[in-house]
């Protein structure tokens, strides 16, 4: 029996941390840490539906810009999970770019970002391309038994 998940390091042991996990029979993937992901082909980057960020050091978060670049112009929702402060960090990255041409895109790219604090609460926000990635706050919720994602 083949495993349902296939994990692989994106870089060698001296490169930025990033673990790419493909799901068998589905064209979707998970990413654990978002270091340099330039070694991934675009088709693999475009499959990423969930990214889990351990902390915001540059070697764990540098790849966000390439993820963004590969997904702009596609209908996609990407769920991003990480520590406190992640919503602000993602928001700042998205605000660093000019989005004056968003009306030309028929598709909408959405980042649903959840930051988890030490007490197990998850604060969430949504950033949509159609809204020039303005932050839309979402409800804070308690995580049952520390479960971050149940898909």
Regions found by a protein language model. Give the residues of each.
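Binuclear metal-dependent hydrolase catalytic cores
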Residues: 1-151
């Amino acid at each position: 029996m083949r495993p349902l998940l296939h994990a692989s390091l994106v870089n060698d042991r001296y490169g930025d941390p990033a673990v790419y996990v493909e799901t068998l029979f589905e064209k979707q993937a998970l990413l654990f840490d978002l270091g340099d992901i330039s070694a991934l082909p675009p088709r693999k980057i475009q499959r990423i539906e969930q990214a889990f960020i351990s902390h915001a050091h540059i070697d764990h978060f540098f790849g966000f810009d390439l993820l963004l670049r590969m997904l702009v112009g596609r209908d996609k929702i990407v769920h991003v999970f990480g520590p406190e402060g992640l919503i602000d960090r993602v928001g700042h990255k998205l605000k660093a770019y000019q989005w004056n041409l968003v009306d030309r895109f028929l598709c909408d790219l959405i980042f649903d970002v959840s930051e988890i604090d030490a007490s197990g609460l998850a604060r969430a926000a949504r950033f949509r391309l159609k809204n020039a990635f303005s932050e839309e706050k979402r409800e804070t919720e308690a995580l049952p038994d520390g479960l971050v994602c149940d898909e």
